[in-house]
């Protein structure tokens, strides 16, 4: 006497038997560009040429280099500075 229940045959709904075998395609591959291209122009510096307006800095001239980007781009948010690679 056999007490085991009959085994149900499990079939895959997506597999077709007897059809042509094609290799499966993976996810699409994206190529990363070497240079970043922005849709808009990068922001301009806010205050330029204020060397003679500051007391005690008359001899430096108006062509001073700002080291900290927050001084030249103080009208922008940090995420905008990061978007254009300034910081």
Swiss-Prot record:
Keyword field contains Chaperone: no
What InterPro entries would the database entry show?
PDE6_gamma, PDE6_gamma_sf
GO CC annotations, alphabetized: photoreceptor outer segment membrane
Recorded GO terms, molecular function? Answer: 3',5'-cyclic-GMP phosphodiesterase activity; cGMP binding
Q: Which Pfam families match?
A: PDE6_gamma
Q: How does it assemble?
A: Oligomer composed of two catalytic chains (alpha and beta), an inhibitory chain (gamma) and the delta chain.
Function, as annotated, reads: Participates in processes of transmission and amplification of the visual signal. cGMP-PDEs are the effector molecules in G-protein-mediated phototransduction in vertebrate rods and cones.
Q: What is this protein called?
A: Retinal rod rhodopsin-sensitive cGMP 3',5'-cyclic phosphodiesterase subunit gamma
* Organism from which the protein derives: Canis lupus familiaris
């Amino acid at each position: 006497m056999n007490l085991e229940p009959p085994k149900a045959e499990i079939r895959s709904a997506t597999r077709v038997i007897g059809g042509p075998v094609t290799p499966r395609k993976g996810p699409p591959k994206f190529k990363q560009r070497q240079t970043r291209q922005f849709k808009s122009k990068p922001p301009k510096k806010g205050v330029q040429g204020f060397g003679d307006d500051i007391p005690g800095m008359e001899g430096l001239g108006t062509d001073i280099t700002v080291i900290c980007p927050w001084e030249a781009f103080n009208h922008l948010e940090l995420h905008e500075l990061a978007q254009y690679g300034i910081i």
